[in-house]
């Protein structure tokens, strides 16, 4: 996108340095998106998130950050924080109107790192891909819901015109003509072989069954947490889609197994203490749940939402193909046990409060000294 923007600017006799290119994304963007902007000298324009817009990119607000130097807009198919899909079609509509009004065409890149292997199989009717003309490129990670090893990722362009030829290298010394478009050089083949095996072995229907099972278990976890009264669930995959009533009891013929009846999203469950629990237990810190669950063998991170909502902390569970209904039952039991234990004044779990002032070698291991990293630019990327 940057190279195509440069070519257009040069053709129009305009500078490519002043004021320089920018890219627009929600403040909830994954760190890889911010890395691109920093490494390739592109100004990052972060759109504030809000509860009303499901902690994701607000297309209408995003247009306040778009101008003739915007090389593109990142739209995320599966927010790292809550698993929500950002509205690709809505964003495209705003950019269509902008082009009609100004003559400036701003493309969309869909970051489908996780959703790229969920949405096409679980909700194929959802329009987020090349069915939308303004989407020019899509990426996804094979090592997430693609079920491959770490190290394989994919990027697909709408057509050859969106990948400038001068970015492609032609190699002749490997016994045949090879074409390369990559930032790394020698790399292992096993992740790609594993990905290819899954493509052949599972096929469309296999990936669909995996995605549907993941979402079903994620809905099970979401409902269990909400019904406990101890937590508020921020993710929405267990809620009926717009236009459907909120309860199967209120809806004649509601099919609880049909994924199309629910808000689309990743099989991710993000939750926090309910307001009622906080009022009754003001001294209990949510981050203690993470620590206690780790002692039981669960890795459930607790972290702040993106800027503008950084006062809200959430716990997050990613449901994958290895997660069964039995595991969900055990996880729920452990979450409720540690949470209820923290609420009891005579519980040993309150000893956590006394541990906060202690520092351990384990707690410091692998961390940089405070201030060693660059200043946070707004996304959730923070110093290790």
Label each PLM-derived region with a short phrase:
Residues 9-12, 92, 202-384:
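Non-catalytic terminal extensions of PLP-dependent enzymes
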Residues 18, 43, 72, 136, ...:
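Generic alpha-helix detector with strongest preference for long hydrophobic helices that associate
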């Amino acid at each position: 996108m940057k190279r195509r923007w440069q070519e257009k600017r040069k053709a129009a006799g305009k500078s490519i340095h002043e004021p320089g290119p920018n890219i627009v994304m929600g403040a909830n963007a994954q760190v890889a998106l911010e890395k691109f902007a920093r490494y390739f000298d592109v100004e990052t324009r972060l759109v504030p998130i809000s509860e009303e817009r499901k902690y994701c990119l607000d297309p209408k607000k995003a247009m306040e950050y778009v101008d003739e130097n915007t090389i593109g807009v990142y739209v995320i198919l599966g927010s790292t924080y809550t698993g929500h899909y950002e509205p690709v079609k809505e964003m495209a509509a705003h950019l269509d109107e902008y082009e009609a009004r100004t003559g400036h065409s701003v493309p969309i890149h869909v970051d489908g790192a996780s959703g790229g292997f969920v949405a096409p199989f679980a909700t194929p009717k959802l329009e987020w891909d090349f069915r939308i003309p303004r989407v020019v490129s899509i990426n996804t990670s094979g090592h997430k819901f693609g079920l491959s090893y770490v190290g394989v990722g994919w990027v697909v362009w709408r057509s050859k015109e969106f990948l400038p030829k001068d970015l492609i290298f032609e190699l002749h010394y490997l016994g045949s003509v090879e074409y390369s478009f990559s930032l790394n050089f020698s790399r292992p083949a096993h992740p790609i072989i594993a990905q290819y095996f899954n493509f052949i072995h599972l096929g469309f229907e296999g990936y669909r069954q995996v995605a549907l099972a993941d979402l079903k278990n994620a809905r099970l976890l979401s409902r269990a947490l909400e019904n406990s009264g101890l937590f508020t669930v921020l993710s929405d995959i267990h809620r009926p889609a717009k236009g459907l009533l909120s309860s199967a009891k209120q809806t004649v013929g509601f099919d609880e197994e049909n994924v199309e009846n629910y808000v689309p999203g990743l099989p991710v469950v993000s939750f926090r203490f309910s307001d009622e629990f906080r009022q009754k237990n003001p001294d209990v810190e949510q981050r203690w749940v993470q620590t206690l669950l780790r002692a039981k063998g669960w890795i459930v991170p607790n972290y702040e939402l993106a800027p503008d909502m950084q006062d809200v902390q959430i716990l997050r569970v990613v449901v994958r193909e290895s997660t069964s209904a039995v595991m969900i039952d055990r996880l729920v039991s452990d979450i409720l046990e540690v949470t209820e234990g923290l609420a009891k004044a005579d519980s040993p779990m309150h000893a956590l409060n006394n541990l906060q002032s202690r520092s351990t070698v384990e707690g410091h291991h692998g961390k940089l000294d405070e201030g060693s990293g660059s200043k946070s630019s707004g996304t959730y990327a923070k110093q290790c």
